[in-house]
Amino acid sequence: MVPLGYNNKYFGYVQDCQQQATDNSPIHYYTGDKQNQSYSQSMCKEQSQNTVTVSPASFNKKAQSTQGSYNRAMKSSSSLYSTCSTTPSKDSLLKNSSYPSWKSLDSSLSHHKSETTSLTSFTSTSSLEPSKISSRSRLLLPKTQTSSSIDLCWKSPSLESNQRVSTSSSTSVQHHEAPSLNIIWTTPSLESNQSEHDSQLCKSKSQKDSSLDRLWSSLLESSQKALSSPSFTNRLQRNSFPPTSSSLEFSRVARNSPLPDCSKPLKIPVSNSNNNVFSLPLSPAKSRKSTPSPHSFLPSRRLSTCQPKPKIVARCDPSTRAINTAVCHPKVQNTASLSDKQRPRQLPSIHPKPNPSGQRVSSPKPCIKNKIASVPCSRLPNKSSVERSVKTEPENEISWALDYSHPCIIKGGSVPVDVVNKIINSISKSTIQKDLSRQILFRRMRGKPNPRPGPRLSSTYSVCLECASAIKSQCNHLSGKRDPRCATLFVIPTPESSTDGKVDVKIILILSLPEKPSSTCFQLPMKDSKSENNLEALDDNLDVLEKITQFFPASESDFIQGLKTKRKCLAVSSESKDLSQEPQSIDWLLYVKNSNGIQLETQVQGPSSSSSSSCSSVSSSSSASSIGRPSPPTPWVDPTPVPVSGYVLAKVRSYHRLPPGTSWLEFIRGSSSDTIKLRQSPPVKAKPVRSHNSKCLKKGKRETSALLRYFQTKFQNEKS
């Protein structure tokens, strides 16, 4: 006999078994436990992801006599794979499938004579090792009369722990009455030696042995040429099927112990030929982690009890009676890539769901669920990285801290130190910092430049002196804004910053105590309202606060001295009851205007300037002029001009306002008496311009005439 070698390829066979008396075929093994079953048992073609299941077929009663000879023939412990071979018939076709599976195939066949029928059984061996391990099987031919059956014995040696063997068979059976198929799939371990491979071979006396050997030799040559092409290696990886979880579990158990373990189920599909050729695909790519089964033959009855039968149908081509390409369920193909990704995780075994008919169906849905479950795991590091970036951003944004500049400035009264400290501590630095940053952002949104440090960039907080804390929403102690227990706390940042990144903050606590004399110091000129209204204006208007803070000294002692001097000025001004604030302001403006003129003019303006010096601390221009010229009050000795000026001012009380269209700055900038003469005629020239508003003309006439009379009388008195 010529040994047959077959590399990386499995194939299916087309056979026509209608001839009964002339066909001689070998058989290796079959069991007689299920021989009493009827031929009417339906055979359905089913395939799992990595396993093949076959329901036990029924055999004729007359075949029981050959059971003893078959059992004696199967004592060899060699590693064998089963394949299908064909008996020469009228149109026997051999067609290789497009999926490579094995690297070597060696078998020798022997035949016996049969009287009326032919019973075919094929034995093949395969090995994944580079060295071609050959195995020989002992094939015997039983004598049957009316049935033609195929009994296939599959044996696969388990190689290294990282290799996996998955096998399947593609067979075809035809008969007039009922074909049957019995496939036993076993895998021995590597410990079986090649010495066991040699078994006794039964030589047949058939005349067609030579033709069969020629057929195998031609097949061997064609297969070796086909396997040399690299396309099969690519298909080896593409046409892979996902292994079931039960097979993975079985492979782990089989690796630990090479001893036989009959408790693990073997999945063998039952295939029905329907008088046509059918195909069962083999997944060679999954052969790296195949299930090494025990080196023993299991009875077909036991296989039927412990095998799950997934429903996967293969297609056949009845016209050509040839094997089609392997067809599996589309879900199985789609999940092939999913199982490859999930192999290293070694998921727990998922038990297949039982059918109403008692069969089990292994579905690939758990693979899809596992993929979906693995998606959030990949997103977890992304979330943690995002949280880290969010945590680091605010730390980079806030690079400066606040530092209170002590002592706190208190205006409008006296407050104990403990109360002031409680008020300051009631407002956290973070809230102040947020409020200041908001104001900067609002100004940028409006298109305004960054505000300079001062009252324009400040935050105000209402404070209750009774609670000694800032008022967030409401306070029961306060009845309104004018309540003496209510105060306003101003927090103003200063431009100086330390090396530590801290910004000094000036804290000013303004008390709303209207009856205090110090409140009159903040009264602006040309204001007819009382001190209470002025305090409300200070609380609401930041521009007023800016003017006030220009005169705040750096230390508390200087501030107290400034308050004392201002109180003295107020006491001096309160003694002159005949002169009100309105003529004082006009007299003060006249003094500033004529300060660069003749000394006579300064002597006349001297007494009035001394009385109006209390208001010189309001604007920067007035304070500079009063400080720069302290000499005019010294030559005031003659009291004669005082009643004249008082007499004149008494007349001009009702006409103290400037004419419309002229500003205080323009009036102050005039330095000589020529400007006064020039201003006598402009009202006449301005009449046609202001004719559209009669009210303005009337007011302008009255105001200009009053001022002209005032200046004329004053100059006449000076000349005299």
Swiss-Prot record:
Its main location: nucleus. Keywords: Nucleus, Phosphoprotein. Residues 227-250, 264-303, 333-366, 602-640, 678-698 are annotated as: Disordered. Residues 630-640 have a biased composition (Pro residues). Residues 687-698 have a biased composition (Basic residues). Expressed exclusively in testis (at protein level). Within testis, expressed mainly in the intermediate compartment of the seminiferous tubules with weaker expression in the basal and adluminal compartments. Phosphorylated by CK2 (casein kinase II), specifically by complexes containing catalytic subunit CSNK2A2. Interacts (via C-terminus) with CSNK2A2. May play a role in chromatin regulation of male germ cells. This is Casein kinase II subunit alpha'-interacting protein. It comes from Mus musculus. The lineage of its organism: Eukaryota, Metazoa, Chordata, Craniata, Vertebrata.
